[in-house]
Amino acid sequence: MPTHLVWFRRDLRLQDNLALAAACRDASARVLALYISTPAQWQAHDMAPRQAAFISAQLNALQTALAEKGIPLLFHEVADFNASIETVKNVCRQHDVSHLFYNYQYEFNERQRDAAVEKTLPSVICEGFDDSVILAPGAVMTGNHEMYKVFTPFKNAWLKRLKEDIPPCVPAPKIRVSGALSTPLTPVSLNYPQQAFDAALFPVEENAVIAQLRQFCAQGADEYALRRDFPAVDGTSRLSASLATGGLSPRQCLHRLLAEQPQALDGGPGSVWLNELIWREFYRHLMTWYPALCKHQPFIRWTKRVAWQENPHYFQAWQKGETGYPIVDAAMRQLNATGWMHNRLRMITASFLVKDLLIDWRLGERYFMSQLIDGDLAANNGGWQWAASTGTDAAPYFRIFNPTTQGERFDRDGEFIRQWLPALRDIPGKAIHEPWRWAEKAGVVLDYPRPIVEHKQARIATLSAYEAARKGA
């Protein structure tokens, strides 16, 4: 009887899990599951404590779900990816594993680890799957067989390729012939700092996540284009955390969207949310093609020469939400308190750090990863490089958000700002976007800082720094 081992990583679900489905295809095989915790590696990768708590909860739910299918979950903890190579080898030897199944991860360290694992298992048949994307890296290329560097042509080619053959979702495995496990389960515990998260916003149980997806696609996807930019409105899917840890697959998102919004592939209702899924694909494909992106390197080489300011005071003010710009500060306090931030606010806060404070985007990238429950290297790096004008198809360097104008445009009446900045709750109407002006006129002393920089002057300094770097190219 063959023994099949499924190595779980960022794919913590039963439904539409390509590696798990392949491992369970042979009804006569004994199927085991493996998860390896690597705290030192996670620390090096700046994994957020809230994401660790989310993964821990998902693992325990996964262990229960697997047990009901008759599949035991083997849990091991080692320091880092290098140590995990030997762990996989030992598990395969101890359990006489004939086949190893896993879903690809596209980050540089993860790819090195997987290649090393396969080299240490010459007698084991290893099968990997492109599970975390809808179309595999390399499936969408230019006429010169190169990776697209601009999103819109990539999107058009991606949609054309998708329409030719939409990848199906695979069902959860059936219960094994041996039946469900009867032995009591030992709870999985991660030796990593953890912080509580809101399980109502970020459900753990697989069925609850699918219900969240169904509700959004049925009731929110068609109006997503109109509502997505306003942080006071519940207009986004909140599925990013489940996508980041693999509690949900992008194929599940695609199929549910098309079931509810069948015109999404042709620019109809739901197409704007589909665009966000394609951006996710774009950044993953880029990371596979350009591994330097995993090493904190800018895509546009001349931006390496930008003379960033080293100003710990400014950086800490940004981290704490004490910059004096209400929309920026409210957004950062939302991030610190919940581990999540609205996407429009991610753009605003990133732009402010880089182009108002002239602080290296990589510091912001790392801080976001250390806080985000939906931390994902490809998406986070892509977003930061877009905001910093260092990435492929990024905002041009001279595009600099005015933080006050952004607040007026996307939180006009200050509803979101008042939620997160209690010191400003009594400021009437639109005056909340420039509280220092209102305070001066009203003769009031606010428990809130004045702006740490003047935007117009900061804009001039940033343009000068970028232009100097570009001319040195």
Swiss-Prot record:
Binding sites annotated in the UniProt record for (6R)-5,10-methylene-5,6,7,8-tetrahydrofolate: 109-110
Annotated region described as Interaction with DNA, given as residue ranges: 276-283, 343-344
A single GO molecular function term of this UniProt record: DNA binding
Transmembrane domains' residue ranges: none
Keyword Nucleotide-binding: yes
GO BP of this protein: DNA repair; response to light stimulus
Cofactors that this protein relies on: FAD; (6R)-5,10-methylene-5,6,7,8-tetrahydrofolate
Domain of life from the UniProt record: Bacteria
Cofactor-binding details, from the entry: Binds 1 FAD per subunit.
Keyword DNA damage recorded: yes
Role this protein plays: Involved in repair of UV radiation-induced DNA damage. Catalyzes the light-dependent monomerization (300-600 nm) of cyclobutyl pyrimidine dimers (in cis-syn configuration), which are formed between adjacent bases on the same DNA strand upon exposure to ultraviolet radiation.
Annotated protein name in UniProt: Deoxyribodipyrimidine photo-lyase
